[in-house]
Amino acid sequence: MSAFTDLETLAGDLKRSSAGVSDYHDRAVTPAQTFAAIRPHLRDFGITRVGLLTALDVLNIPVAFATRPNSHTLSVFQGKGIDNEAAMTSAAMEAVETRIAEIAPADLTQATVESMRAERAAMIDLDNVARCAPDEIGSRPIPWCSGLDILSGSSVFVPWWLVGLDHRGERPPGFEQSSDGLASGNTPSEAVLHGLCELVERDAWALTQLKSPERLKESRIDPASFGDAVIDVMTDRITRAGMKLLLLDMTTDIGIPAFLAVIMPGNLSDRVDARWSHVCGGCGCHPDPVRAALRAITEAAQSRLTAIAGSRDDFSPRIYQRLDRSAAMQQVVELCEGDGRMRPFQPRHHRKATIQETIGHIADRLVATGIEQIVVVPFPHPALPVSVVRVIVPGLEVDISGQYIQLGMRAVNTIRGAES
């Protein structure tokens, strides 16, 4: 299948109308059905085990893992959800999508950035991609693939090093590889929606880290104010386990609900053995605030279990060391332990929408804040019964760590606001 045909298939799916089967996830079929579809293919993608980690912790919030020993990045992947099927599917899909991103297409175009610009080729706006430093790329030819700008409907060239994943050997100069925006789904549209939400979440988290302590304190949310039964169950499990839950509203001017959840022992300040792994966080984003909050809470639980299982290849030894109460960590602990009043979440009007309508809503909000491109690169695979894409949105921020990270105007304006 040609790259042009792949983009046509993606564009066609984005014009369809398909709804999720549950109030709690955007999938055309249930997580159990998705897992049943991909299970026969797991070994072909090098995935040797998928299992549950939930019982290793006291929270009883479903968390799963998938193992792929010969990965070019991490060899263990995590998944979370509101039930076991969702967690298992989440872990397996993450392992699958990462493997797919390791396979470079045979028809990559080799060209320098300068030659692309000289020929006025339609390309992604590298000057505003957070994980790219154009001045550091150099004058050597680099590989390019084709993506679809869903705002204009046009094909654009994208450097493969912004799309694929390979952490072996030397990293390509000028690019900070990451899994941000790499997503999968039962259909291309499902995958695009998941990738978009993740990028808006990363932007919100990056800006949250730049806010003043006063602004953060004002952002604390009472989980009970959502009035959702599943959030109430999760909160009750955390409390019964002797833990505290901090929920911060990270929603930016984009207007798509985004939250940070932090779980820590209720007696952390009294413990002489307090460690970094005792304070675990997670983020979530979705136009439906309940889904956004649940993603944050379940990801915080996933962070705890990942530390307990010791299953991340890229863990720093520091995570198991005594908590030294650095300024940033002290701030988080104080927010968790503070007795100040939490504000109720003011729900924005949210109506049930199809997956494609939800993508359109997010795209409209991004355009309203100055975003000019939303680029999607599909990863077609003949044997795979699900879809994998990479979504890239020039102009959105990412966590400010890495050699080739560009600080954008959204971050600059947040810093100015914190200083004023």
From Swiss-Prot:
<protein>
    <recommendedName>
        <fullName>Uncharacterized protein in tfuA 3'region</fullName>
    </recommendedName>
</protein>
<feature type="domain" description="YcaO">
    <location>
        <begin position="79"/>
        <end position="420"/>
    </location>
</feature>
<dbReference type="Pfam" id="PF02624">
    <property type="entry name" value="YcaO"/>
</dbReference>
<dbReference type="InterPro" id="IPR003776">
    <property type="entry name" value="YcaO-like_dom"/>
</dbReference>
